């Protein structure tokens, strides 16, 4: 099970990230002042992690055990998932989705901001959705 230390270390390893504790103790990770991941203890037992996803990933993940549309964010039509209980995702899969969230948010920044942060030009990285499609075809 992922800990705050694991979560913060992984998010901090992604390019051009910043960390702030806000919203009643949530660990909020941003790229270019835009949130890509939020970590917060649920009932002081389980680290809940909220991350942005594509429409395809949202449809795949929203009804999986231990996952749900993120409260507040998803209700406004934004595609965010919260990993809140077991079984949820493995730590490895959770890291992939956090990295994908970072990629999605980074791509939404202006080119000017991407350049300022050293994120532009992006290398062609296959999205999680593309990887899922290749697995289904193969």
Language-model segments: residues:
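Charge-dense, helix-prone N-terminal extensions
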Residues: 1-138
């Amino acid at each position: 099970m992922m800990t705050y230390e694991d979560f913060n270390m992984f998010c901090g390893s992604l390019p051009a990230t910043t960390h702030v504790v806000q919203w009643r103790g949530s660990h909020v990770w941003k790229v270019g002042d835009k949130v890509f991941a939020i970590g917060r203890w649920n009932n002081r037992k389980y680290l809940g992690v909220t991350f942005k996803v594509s429409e395809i990933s949202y449809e795949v993940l929203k009804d999986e055990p231990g996952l749900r549309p993120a409260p507040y964010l998803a209700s406004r039509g934004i595609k965010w998932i919260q990993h809140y209980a077991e079984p949820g995702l493995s730590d490895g899969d959770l890291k992939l989705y956090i990295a994908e969230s970072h990629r999605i948010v980074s791509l939404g920044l202006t080119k000017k901001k991407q350049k300022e942060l050293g994120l532009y030009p992006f290398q062609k990285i296959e999205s999680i959705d593309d990887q899922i499609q290749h697995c289904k075809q193969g």
